[in-house]
Amino acid sequence: MEFVKLQCNICFSVAEIKNYFLQPIDRLTIIPVLELDTCKHQLCSMCIRKIRKRKKVPCPLCRVESLHFNVYSVNRNVVDVIKCSASSVAQWNKINANFDAASLASVLFEKSLLDDAEDNNANADDTMLSEAQAILKKLQVDIAEQTQLNIKQQLDLDKLQQTSVSMQEKLDKIKSDYNNMHKSFKELQLKRITTEKALKSLNDDYAKLASKNAKLSSENKVLSNKNIELIKHKNLLQNEYTTLQSYKCITNATITTNVTINVD
């Protein structure tokens, strides 16, 4: 990213940070928007000073109080965080017009001022050439990295597609097994219903046969009783018949005797 604009969430002041990574010299950058230590919301130093209550800063966005805020400093490949007390922010100066930050920095930090006006004129071409070479080198590196990334992504995509095909095959097999099991389950249900109907029919037939058997048993008992009575009656008749036969024989003998006597 070549540059970025940051905005205070309260007063909406804008700060722009430009990236100098293409230039061969080191660049020191202080990120102007400050971060509340507790809730991590970002404000400018003036808003922190104005909304501060004693030693604490109540965040106007989430109402969480912070005792400190963080300042981030970037130097080449190192990022430092400076933890500052909220009570340490104080107004240094104020004028009617806007400050020229560059002029103010040249006065405040005079001992650290680097005068590169002559170097800019003498080394303009070298700087442009260095920037162009750095841009070309970075583009080559980016292209190589992107190519490797594309190859890796393609390999990952192929692997993912193979995995997807394998999973689809497994899913189709699971669906087929499920359909077969469902079909078998339906068949078992039909067999169970048929068996239950047959069992019910057998139970009904058994109940009918049991009822008929009980009726026949009752009738057989009645017939048995009648048969006993008939046997008794037969025996009685047999005895009477025997008695009659005996009486008949006696009678016949008596008659024969009487006839014989009369003849004589």
From Swiss-Prot:
Keywords: Host nucleus, Metal-binding, Zinc, Zinc-finger
Zinc-finger in keyword set: yes
GO MF: zinc ion binding
Zinc finger (RING-type) stretch: 8-63
Chain coiled-coil ranges: none
Chief location of this protein within or outside the cell: host cell
InterPro entries linked: Znf_C3HC4_RING-type (IPR018957), Znf_RING (IPR001841), Znf_RING/FYVE/PHD (IPR013083), Znf_RING_CS (IPR017907)
Superkingdom assignment: Viruses
Subcellular location: Host nucleus
GO cellular component: host cell nucleus
SMART domains according to UniProt: RING (SM00184)
Short name of one Pfam family: zf-C3HC4
Protein role: Plays a role in the proper expression of late and very late genes.
Name of the protein: Zinc finger protein CG30
